[in-house]
Design a protein with these regions (language model features):
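A short core secondary-structure module
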Residues: 156, 162-204
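Glycine-rich flavin
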Residues: 35, 39-42, 49-162, 167
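Structured, charged N-terminal subsegments at the starts of enzyme catalytic cores
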Residues: 7-21, 25-42, 51-55
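Amphipathic, well-ordered alpha-helical segments in soluble domains
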Residues: 12, 16-19, 262-269, 295, ...
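Glycine-rich beta->alpha junctions and the first turn(s) of the following alpha-helix
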Residues: 210-297
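A generic structural signal for well-ordered coil/turn residues at beta-strand boundaries
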Residues: 124, 140-142, 171-173, 186, ...
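Short, structured patches in soluble enzyme cores that scaffold and shape functional sites
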Residues: 130-132, 148, 163, 178-181, ...
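C-terminal helix-coil-helix/basic helical segment that borders enzyme active sites and/or dimer interfaces
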Residues: 25-29, 300-313
Length: 313
């Protein structure tokens, strides 16, 4: 696929976002995700953000994909920021696999595993449940323990530990996380088949705390306690070191794009409310209005600069 295919997906998302926006008042009261929203996004081609262009997807490397991907999620945020944030997790997570083709410790096995994940990404949503209490959001500071399973499969493990900010819990088919193997120098990346798992602890996954609805109200960013929960380890232990610089860039850009979409909405809403009133505003009100416009303009300049830096990488 070339850039025209990304543009086609963007146009599809613009139409979907416009439909979402018609129900803004109702959507702002939601405390959970609607699966039908994500069915529309999948039909629009958004899942292909997790597939390389040479395999019929949209990923053309960070330099060529950064602008298109951020445009997609910013567009979605115009219609529903919660849906946009959860959808953002799919490409943000898949870059861990898309961004690393060659490793030294298990080159052929990694290529096979990487390809299997890419195939899953065509039709399944990916998310993340990596943050832990006390980690400050640093996935490398995990205290979760990984234990080898008894089935003899090299990548088969169970994990035990506390995780939170699992955005899209109950929606995502698969989630990545980090955990530490006994004796290993650092943590490894694992992925969990999480869709439709009970949250009562019967299979090792217990809902510790449901998302409290603060901020992004309907993202289902729940907290969990895992106890000997099945997990698949990435076959290479080099992955986090190799790909983290790329994932940090694209992840931060995507999340910033959601915030910029919210800012777009706020500015548009304010402009509509102030139509016909600007000439009668008091001096203080005019100063505050111009300050708001300037702050959003400055945010846009910073965002544009970050995208250009990614394109030049």
């Amino acid at each position: 696929m070339n850039r025209e295919n990304s543009q086609s997906v963007i146009e599809n998302l613009q139409a979907i976002s416009a439909t979402f926006a018609k129900d803004t008042a109702e959507r702002q009261t939601r405390r959970e995700l609607d699966p039908a929203d994500f069915e529309q996004l999948a039909e629009a081609g958004f899942l292909l953000t997790g597939v390389p262009a040479e395999q019929g997807g949209l990923w053309r490397g960070i330099a060529e994909s950064a602008r298109d991907y951020t445009t997609m999620v910013r567009t979605l945020a115009h219609g529903d920021p919660c849906v946009a944030l959860v959808a953002t997790m799919h490409p943000a997570v898949m870059v861990y696999f898309l961004g690393c083709e060659q490793v030294n410790d298990a080159p052929q096995a990694w290529l096979a595993q990487r390809q299997s994940v890419i195939e899953l990404a065509r039709n399944h949503w990916w998310g993340t449940v990596t943050s832990e209490p006390g980690s400050g959001g640093d996935m490398l500071k995990t205290k979760t323990a990984a234990k080898k399973s008894a089935d003899g499969i090299d990548t088969s493990y169970t994990i035990s530990g506390n995780k939170h900010f699992g955005s899209g819990s109950g929606h995502a088919d698969y989630m990545i996380t980090t955990a530490r193997r006994k004796g290993a120098e650092g943590p490894d990346l694992f992925y969990l088949k999480i869709k439709d798992e009970p949250w009562d602890g019967s299979t090792g996954c217990t809902l510790a705390s449901a998302w409290d609805g603060i901020g992004m109200t309907a993202t289902q960013s729940h907290a969990f306690r895992f106890e000997n929960f099945p997990a698949t380890k990435t076959i290479t232990s080099e992955l986090l070191g190799k790909v983290s610089p790329i994932t940090a860039v694209i992840g931060n850009l995507l999340f910033a794009a959601v915030a910029m979409g919210i800012a777009d909405n706020a500015l548009s809403f304010a402009k509509d409310k102030l139509k016909g009133k600007l000439q009668n505003m008091r001096a203080y009100e005019r100063v505050e209005w111009n300050r708001c416009r300037n702050e959003i303009w400055l945010a846009q300049q910073a965002f544009d600069g970050a995208v250009r830096a990614a394109e030049a990488s």
